[in-house]
Amino acid sequence: MTDWLDILKQQTAAGDQMSKTVTDMLADPAITEDQVKTLFDALEQQAEFVEKLRVALEKFDHDFPVIRAAERLEERYGDLAAGVAEKLKALRS
């Protein structure tokens, strides 16, 4: 049986690390458009995975705080992707 709570914990830890990594990368003045695009694509994939995780948690009737934690993680990846998209837009200007 899949341990959805363990997966959520792992993904939350990965999200914490990703937040720091994204911030550091976007602050680097030498970052290239290709690097930003790759970063955006990775964040989009991660957001899609977390969305599927949230749906699974809902399907298996986990408590609201667990589902809410997955929603917050999904929002975090969305916010990170939006920040990266802004950087990509700025680099293309």
Give names to the regions the model predicted.
Residues 21-25, 52-56, 83, 87-90:
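Amphipathic, soluble alpha-helical interaction motifs
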Residues 26-36, 58-68, 93:
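Charged, low-complexity interaction regions
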Residues 66-93:
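Amphipathic alpha-helical binding modules
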